[in-house]
Amino acid sequence: MDFSLPSEFAKSALYYCPQFGQFICNSDYRIERNGIDQYLLIYINSGSLCIRTDGMTAEAHEGEIALFDCRKPHCYWCPDKVDFYWFHFNGAGSKQYTEYLTERFGLVHEKQPMLSLKDQFRTVVHSAQYGMSTQFASMNEHQISIAVHSIL
């Protein structure tokens, strides 16, 4: 898991990702929280991940994404082995967009075209990692915001 500190501009005008990474987990993996002030997007590379929040329960499988509001109590776990990219995000329009998409489609989405979706997740994770230690951090904030918007 990695962390990044968004600029004041990113906090006010862009989507930004303060935490991100790739996890490979077994059935011991379980996260249960009362809430944190962020939203979460997950892309399943292989395996499956179960999610429970806001009166809904769903299971995301390989090639699918999960989206939910982490400000509400939530729990997610893997029934077996799972490999996934993930990032917490926030910023302009995050609340409204997350509410709209989860009300319309639920917690798990099968996006089309799926081929580029995994690349967008990689862009977020790698741009955030690269931006943490270089003079290109502000440029990467824009790339991250564009990639998050493309995924949504």
State what each model feature region is.
Residues 49-54, 72-74, 82, 97-99, ...:
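Short C-terminal domain-edge/linker segments immediately following a structured domain
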Residues 1-61, 72, 78, 95, ...:
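Generic protein-terminus/edge-of-domain signal
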